[in-house]
Amino acid sequence: MATSKLKTQNVVVSLSLTLTLVLVLLTSKANSAETVSFSWNKFVPKQPNMILQGDAIVTSSGKLQLNKVDENGTPKPSSLGRALYSTPIHIWDKETGSVASFAASFNFTFYAPDTKRLADGLAFFLAPIDTKPQTHAGYLGLFNENESGDQVVAVEFDTFRNSWDPPNPHIGINVNSIRSIKTTSWDLANNKVAKVLITYDASTSLLVASLVYPSQRTSNILSDVVDLKTSLPEWVRIGFSAATGLDIPGESHDVLSWSFASNLPHASSNIDPLDLTSFVLHEAI
């Protein structure tokens, strides 16, 4: 147990240091690259630079609440909410062939009144700039049932087993389909703060997602190769989407903070600020 606790503490420290380093590197290349960055430690009603869709609201306490709840805080069935950063992100450039590296960090909680009846989950995603809410429940508001023409790259935190899912709650990487290309088990904790770091290294096309529960001393990590040029348009929006169950409340989803930075190098720049990120993340475990 002592070893497990120490490893988790090391993960938390390493992820925090990694995010700080990544954000500094990404935002220091303004003269040689196209950069976008922001950091919100909490939210405010009528949050600037945010587009809310569906049931999403910002509460008076500063939480981004993605799903409807009743006066007692119990989640309501068939709720779908999304929140987008309003500024489009130039994720790759057709003229130069360059692809952006990025880092996203956020804290979130989910609350389920009955942990034996969970549904459906939350996702961080990149999608076309005109993206609209899609099918709710198991499709998490990201995909249509026929999945025709969907251009979405997402990291999902999925609590309900649909026909295309593994048997347990999981973290998945999704590329233009609700069927994840790779998953790992999610040691979820009800109503506890989860710290998430998602990075994309353009030099290797490696997408890495990690989740840590500091209070529970547990962590999960997942990675796979994703080609953003073949999966997404040149310009995208980023954001969150979360859904409750069709016939059961399942769980509500709240985002507590959110930071993001991206770097699209020009053709003359051969410096990739994330070339060590995946190594640091893997070495932290």
From Swiss-Prot:
<comment type="similarity">
    <text>Belongs to the leguminous lectin family.</text>
</comment>
<feature type="glycosylation site" description="N-linked (GlcNAc...) asparagine">
    <location>
        <position position="107"/>
    </location>
</feature>
<dbReference type="InterPro" id="IPR013320">
    <property type="entry name" value="ConA-like_dom_sf"/>
</dbReference>
<dbReference type="Pfam" id="PF00139">
    <property type="entry name" value="Lectin_legB"/>
</dbReference>
<comment type="subunit">
    <text>Homotetramer.</text>
</comment>
<dbReference type="InterPro" id="IPR016363">
    <property type="entry name" value="L-lectin"/>
</dbReference>
<dbReference type="GO" id="GO:0030246">
    <property type="term" value="F:carbohydrate binding"/>
</dbReference>
<dbReference type="InterPro" id="IPR001220">
    <property type="entry name" value="Legume_lectin_dom"/>
</dbReference>
<dbReference type="InterPro" id="IPR000985">
    <property type="entry name" value="Lectin_LegA_CS"/>
</dbReference>
<keyword id="KW-0325">Glycoprotein</keyword>
<keyword id="KW-0732">Signal</keyword>
<keyword id="KW-0430">Lectin</keyword>
<comment type="function">
    <text>Binds GalNAc and galactose.</text>
</comment>
<dbReference type="InterPro" id="IPR019825">
    <property type="entry name" value="Lectin_legB_Mn/Ca_BS"/>
</dbReference>
<dbReference type="InterPro" id="IPR050258">
    <property type="entry name" value="Leguminous_Lectin"/>
</dbReference>
<feature type="signal peptide">
    <location>
        <begin position="1"/>
        <end position="32"/>
    </location>
</feature>
<protein>
    <recommendedName>
        <fullName>Lectin</fullName>
    </recommendedName>
</protein>
